[in-house]
Each structure stands twice: as structure tokens, then as C-alpha cells.
């Protein structure tokens, strides 16, 4: 299964960061520093777990989408990409 939307989202994130538009949530988050980006990823991960335990499937999907977005921002902030994660997953499947 391929999820092309993640690659597109990764490109949007990269572009928003390059544009340095202070009205962009993505740019503001990125500019706030790695500590804040990592904290946001942690918050979103907890929200996915809470949704899985106490809320419906729709809520889990919504929170998982938030987590994936914030994880892509974190990867970009560290100079990594979705391709790096995919390569690691492929290695683990051998």
C-alpha cells in the first residue's frame, strides 16, 4: 500500500518552511525549535492513545492524522524525510 498523500504533505511542509511565512502554522512550529516540535509530537501521540482507549474510530483517525503531520515536521526539522523512515521499515521487513 502506498500513501501518496504523505509525500505530498511532506512537500507542503518543506515549502512552508522555505517560504518563512509567519502566518503559517507549519513555519511557526518549525521556528519555535526542536524542543517544541518534539513536545508537540509527544502530545499528539498521547492524543492518539487516548482516542484509541476512550473515543471512536473516527477520532483515532483524526488524531493519527495530526500525529503524522507533526512527525513529518519533526523529521524535516532533523534533516530527515519520510523516505528515510520507509527505508528503515523496508530493512526491518527482510
From Swiss-Prot:
It is found in: Cytoplasm. Pfam families: PRA-PH. Signal peptide: none annotated. Its main location: cytoplasm. One of its GO terms (biological process) is L-histidine biosynthetic process. Disulfide bonds: none annotated. It is an enzyme of class 3 (hydrolase). Keywords: Amino-acid biosynthesis, ATP-binding, Cytoplasm, Histidine biosynthesis, Hydrolase, Nucleotide-binding. GO terms for molecular function: ATP binding; phosphoribosyl-ATP diphosphatase activity. Gene3D superfamilies: MazG-like. One of its GO terms (cellular component) is cytoplasm. Its EC number is 3.6.1.31. It catalyses: 1-(5-phospho-beta-D-ribosyl)-ATP + H2O = 1-(5-phospho-beta-D-ribosyl)-5'-AMP + diphosphate + H(+). Pathway: Amino-acid biosynthesis; L-histidine biosynthesis; L-histidine from 5-phospho-alpha-D-ribose 1-diphosphate: step 2/9. InterPro entries: HisE (IPR008179), PRib-ATP_PPHydrolase-like (IPR021130). NCBIfam families: histidine_hisI. Belongs to the PRA-PH family. This is Phosphoribosyl-ATP pyrophosphatase. It comes from Pyrobaculum neutrophilum (strain DSM 2338 / JCM 9278 / NBRC 100436 / V24Sta). The lineage of its organism: Archaea, Thermoproteota, Thermoprotei, Thermoproteales, Thermoproteaceae. The gene is hisE.
Amino acid at each position: 500500500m502506498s500513501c501518496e498523500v504523505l509525500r505530498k504533505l511532506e512537500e507542503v511542509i518543506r515549502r512552508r518552511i522555505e517560504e518563512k511565512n509567519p502566518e503559517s502554522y507549519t513555519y511557526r512550529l518549525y521556528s519555535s525549535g526542536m524542543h517544541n516540535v518534539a513536545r508537540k509530537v509527544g502530545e499528539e501521540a498521547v492524543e492518539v492513545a487516548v482516542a484509541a482507549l476512550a473515543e471512536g474510530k473516527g477520532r483515532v483517525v483524526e488524531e493519527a492524522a495530526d500525529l503524522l503531520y507533526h512527525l513529518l515536521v519533526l523529521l524535516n526539522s532533523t534533516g530527515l524525510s519520510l523516505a528515510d523512515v520507509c527505508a528503515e521499515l523496508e530493512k526491518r521487513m527482510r
